[in-house]
From Swiss-Prot:
GO MF assignments: electron transfer activity; heme binding; metal ion binding
Name of the encoding gene: CYCS
Entry annotated with the keyword rRNA-binding: no
PANTHER family: CYTOCHROME C (PTHR11961)
Name the UniProt record assigns to this protein: Cytochrome c
Function text: Electron carrier protein. The oxidized form of the cytochrome c heme group can accept an electron from the heme group of the cytochrome c1 subunit of cytochrome reductase. Cytochrome c then transfers this electron to the cytochrome oxidase complex, the final protein carrier in the mitochondrial electron-transport chain. Plays a role in apoptosis. Suppression of the anti-apoptotic members or activation of the pro-apoptotic members of the Bcl-2 family leads to altered mitochondrial membrane permeability resulting in release of cytochrome c into the cytosol. Binding of cytochrome c to Apaf-1 triggers the activation of caspase-9, which then accelerates apoptosis by activating other caspases.
Length: 105
């Protein structure tokens, strides 16, 4: 069972320096993640993506995020995201549950 509060802590520690989740939130080094679930890679309006992100052509959901967040550069070679990933599956599940809630409010 995942834990949204743990997921929020992981987001604050590992993601928030580059991403926002609020509706209408600004892009930082990385795109605003509001509306992430069900969106195709490289599609946040107003953010400049690499061709690798635009051309990946997957839709973000629990399964794709689980794989991507383990090793972003392996999942999308050429991504600008300079993040090593979250290696522990339980932590990724917590983070994804937090993102599911936070990017949809």
């Amino acid at each position: 069972m995942s834990d949204i509060e743990k997921g929020k802590k992981i987001f604050v520690q590992k993601c928030a320096q580059c991403h926002t989740v609020d509706k209408g939130g600004k892009h930082k080094t990385g795109p605003n993640l509001h509306g992430l679930f069900g969106r195709k890679t490289g599609q946040a309006a107003g953010f400049s993506y690499t061709d690798a992100n635009k051309n990946k052509g997957i839709t973000w959901g629990e399964d794709t995020l689980m794989e991507y967040l383990e090793n972003p550069k392996k999942y999308i070679p050429g991504t600008k995201m300079i993040f090593a990933g979250v290696k522990k599956k339980g932590e990724r599940a917590d983070l994804i549950d937090y993102l599911k809630k936070a990017t949809n409010e």
